[in-house]
Structures are given as C-alpha cells and as structure tokens.
Amino acid sequence: MNALTLPDIAAQASRQALPLDWVGMCGIALPILIDGQRLTATADAGVSLDDGAARGIHMSRLYLALEMLDQQPLTPALLRNVLQRFLDSHEGLSNNAYLRIHTDLLLKRPALVSPLAGWKRYPVSIEARLENQMFHVELKIDVTYSSTCPCSAALARQLIQQQFLDDFGDTSLRHEDVLTWLGSANGIVATPHSQRSSAQLLITLDGDQAGLPINDLIDNVEAALGTAVQTAVKRADEQAFALANGQNLMFCEDAARRLNLALKRSDAVKAFHLKVIHAESLHAHDAVAESRWTRNPA
C-alpha cells in the first residue's frame, strides 16, 4: 500500500487575497515561572497574517514555541524570544507577533500587628508584542484595597459631637467620664461608610528590564494607598486596619492621585493607565477615577 501525503490545507492559497491583523489561539493552558513561583496560566498567542494570498497560519508552530515558557523564569527577554520564534516559524507570512498571558499571582501577606499571615491573590496579565521588530511589554495588575469616604467621616464626627452635647451639655466632666463615654455606644453614634475598592493598572514597561517587577509594583501600590485588604487577622489586626482606614480617608480622586505619583517613581515604568473603582456602599453605583501618564524620552 502506498503511503499518502497528509494534506496541508493552510498552505493553500486563499480565495480572498486579504491580510488579517491577528490570527492565533486563545485560552491555551500552560505553567509559567514568576519570581520562583510555578503558576497555572492561560495564553493567547497569535501573529498577523500579512500575506493575504495565504490561506492561514501554522497554529501548531505557535503552540510548540510556548514550551519555552515552562522551562525558564518569565522575563522580557524570554517573551521577546518566544515572539521571535513565532515570526521565524512564519517567515514570509507574518510581520507581527503577539502573546498575552493571564494568571493569578499568590503573595504571602503578613497581618498588620499579629504574627499571622495568609495568601493573597492578584490577577495579572502580561502582554508582549513584536511589531515591525519593535518590542513592547505591558502588565495588567488588579489590587484590592479599602476606601473610607472623607465626607462621610466628617458627617459622622459631627454627629458624635452633637451626641456629646446632648449627653453632657455644659456639665463639668472628669477625664474618666469622657473616657467612659467615648467607649460607649453613644461615643460612636455614627460611622463613615467604607467599601472594598479596586485599582486596575495597565503599565507599559521598559523592554530592557531584566525581570518583570510585578511584586515591587504591587508593594508600591499598596504602600501608597495604605489600606490593602488583609488575609488572616486577629482583633489587634482589625483594630490596626480601622486605624489605617481612618488615617487614609480617600475619595476615588485621592486614590488615583496617590497611585499616579507612586507609579511615576518607578524607573521600570514607561507609561501607565490606571483606573480606581470604589464600589460605593452608600450608592448603588461605583465611583471611578482614571489617570494616564507617559514618561518623556531622556
């Protein structure tokens, strides 16, 4: 029996001679290495189809090139090598290559006061592009934090002042009386509203970076906000968290400005687009602020 040659339909000519911006695969499961952690990820891999006469690309070649990602720590240099392999395997067909990786980074976070600690999840996406031999790499990071409304805090303080006047008027008080009152239900007759909030960061990195500064960026963002959500806590930690919220009252505008200044201080950041979302507990809608910035060339 004669062996038949397997057909390669993708190598045939297209009936419509049209180039395509992006062709590839989405949702490819793979492991990656970031800062010593082996993480489960999904990848979207593709190339441009610039030869409009070609029927299609060779998706299996892109798939096989992704094997590089589970063998080495993820760095800008590795991402560029993968993209170059995409193009080398599609010589004459494609000029541009694209790779998006989605994962959840787990960081062990200590409690504010007690010796407890717990794991915290940070959704991260890494997008790399090689367009006309120009390399670009971007990070998308989501960071959750708590925000307490400054206006609501002022209104709550006023109600507490009024309750104090109602309870004591012009009565002469001892220190112990005031201390007892402050520790009673009347001493906190009103509380400001607060909510879990989210910072969504899109950061363009310097492609010459040796690594991906994901941990450093997260640490800087949480330090700038001062109210990162916690993991394992005791009562002392919860009290410290209440203090942190009271010392970091924030409208969404305040949070956006804090993050703007923090990200500008990182030499690894070439540009960013940040969005903060405060899921208002007072309202049925969200309060949102955005900020963009691009570093001027030296």
UniProtKB/Swiss-Prot annotation:
Coiled-coil boundaries: none
Q: Which reaction does it catalyse?
A: GTP + H2O = 7,8-dihydroneopterin 3'-triphosphate + formate + H(+)
For this UniProt record, the keywords arranged alphabetically read as follows: Hydrolase
For the biological process aspect of GO, one term held by this record is: tetrahydrofolate biosynthetic process
Give the protein name, as stated in the record.
Answer: GTP cyclohydrolase FolE2
Q: Where is this site: May be catalytically important?
A: C149
Q: Which family does it belong to?
A: Belongs to the GTP cyclohydrolase IV family.
Instruction: Give the EC class as a word.
Output: hydrolase
Q: What does this protein do?
A: Converts GTP to 7,8-dihydroneopterin triphosphate.
* Matches recorded under InterPro entries: GTP_cyclohydrolase_FolE2, GTP_cyclohydrolase_FolE2/MptA
Keyword Hydrolase set for record: yes
